[in-house]
Amino acid sequence: MKVRPSVKPMCEHCKVIRRKGRVMIICSANPKHKQRQGK
């Protein structure tokens, strides 16, 4: 899980979701692409 100021989809499998007011990226193909937006 990477925590970044700005999250962007890294491939076509990345999905942008919101959990508890946080923007997150989840990826079915490559788990390394998981990201969460910081403060």
UniProtKB/Swiss-Prot annotation:
Entry GO MF terms:
structural constituent of ribosome
Q: Which GO terms describe its cellular component?
A: cytoplasm; ribonucleoprotein complex; ribosome
* Pfam families assigned to the protein according to its UniProt record, in alphabetical order: Ribosomal_L36
PROSITE patterns noted in UniProt: RIBOSOMAL_L36
Keywords assigned by UniProt?
Ribonucleoprotein, Ribosomal protein
Q: Which GO terms describe its biological process?
A: translation
HAMAP family with a match to the protein in the record: Ribosomal_bL36
Kindly give the PANTHER family that the UniProt entry links to this protein. Answer: 50S RIBOSOMAL PROTEIN L36, CHLOROPLASTIC, LARGE RIBOSOMAL SUBUNIT PROTEIN BL36C
Record's family?
Belongs to the bacterial ribosomal protein bL36 family.
Protein name in the entry: Large ribosomal subunit protein bL36
Name the source organism: Lactiplantibacillus plantarum (strain ATCC BAA-793 / NCIMB 8826 / WCFS1)
| Gene this chain is encoded by | rpmJ
